[in-house]
UniProtKB/Swiss-Prot annotation:
PANTHER family: 50S RIBOSOMAL PROTEIN L4 (PTHR10746), LARGE RIBOSOMAL SUBUNIT PROTEIN UL4M (PTHR10746:SF6). GO terms for molecular function: rRNA binding; structural constituent of ribosome. InterPro entries: Ribosomal_uL4, Ribosomal_uL4-like, Ribosomal_uL4_dom_sf. It comes from Chlamydia caviae (strain ATCC VR-813 / DSM 19441 / 03DC25 / GPIC) (Chlamydophila caviae). This is Large ribosomal subunit protein uL4. The gene is rplD. Residues 54-74 are annotated as: Disordered. The keyword Iron-sulfur does not apply.
Length: 224
């Protein structure tokens, strides 16, 4: 078991959270696994639909624009040639085969678990008591949210907040308070976590319930 301290809205220690040792078990080549997962996320965001028309596909008459000789101009075959306005494109992009990258569910869970464990080992993950997300701010106050970050010694840079989906109706005060802070990278929910956001975030603030639910999900192997 690994014990992590959790903090209340005042930055005081409010107890500890237990994480099983299985959460930190590395499967195979961890760095390669994370790389493959992040490459898959970026590749699958692309549309792969860029398409241009060549000279045989554009809508133009095949009639010669002017006679072959006597004008002093270079001879031209038709207005579909690429040198004319509205002509075909030479070597333009075409839709390729489906280049979406598939990553197994087991590999995805292992990559996210490794990213979270690295944040824990480098002291860049702060566990907040559930009350911080649900009842700490009845109305949005950016100053109070910033005070919470400073009291927990969170570096105000690239912060990702993660909450449990069950708190979605009660965390509006905190979400709106964080919206105006440039140091906050995003606000997401445990089961919807994106590995790319997690990897690019410098610090993570996660609620106790979200951490327990996410740890159980990543270890047990339940379907996404």
């Amino acid at each position: 078991m690994v014990l992590l301290s959790k903090f209340d809205f005042s930055g005081n220690k409010a107890g500890e959270v237990e994480l099983p040792d299985a959460f930190f078990v590395q499967e195979g080549n961890g760095l390669q696994l994370v790389k493959d997962y992040l490459v898959a996320i970026r590749a699958n965001k692309r549309q792969w639909s860029a398409c241009t028309r060549n000279r045989s596909e554009v809508s133009h008459s095949t009639k010669k624009p002017f006679k072959q000789k006597g004008t002093g101009n270079a001879r031209q075959g038709c207005l579909a040639s690429p040198q004319f306005r509205g002509g075909g494109v030479v070597f333009g992009p075409k839709p390729k085969f489906d280049q979406h990258v598939r990553i197994n569910r087991k590999e995805k869970r292992a990559a996210i678990r490794l990213l979270l464990s690295q944040k824990i080992q480098t002291n860049r993950l702060i566990v907040a008591d559930d009350s911080v997300f649900t009842s700490s701010l009845a109305s949005p106050k950016t100053k109070e949210a910033l005070r919470f970050l400073k009291s927990c010694n969170v570096e105000c840079r690239g912060i990702l907040f993660i909450d449990d989906l069950d708190h979605a109706q009660n965390n509006e005060g905190l979400r709106l308070s964080l919206r105006n802070l440039s140091a906050v990278r995003g606000f997401t929910y445990g089961m919807n976590i994106n590995g790319y956001d997690l990897a690019s975030a410098r610090n993570v603030v996660i609620s106790e319930k979200a951490l327990k639910g996410l740890a159980g999900h990543l270890i047990s192997g339940t379907k996404d």
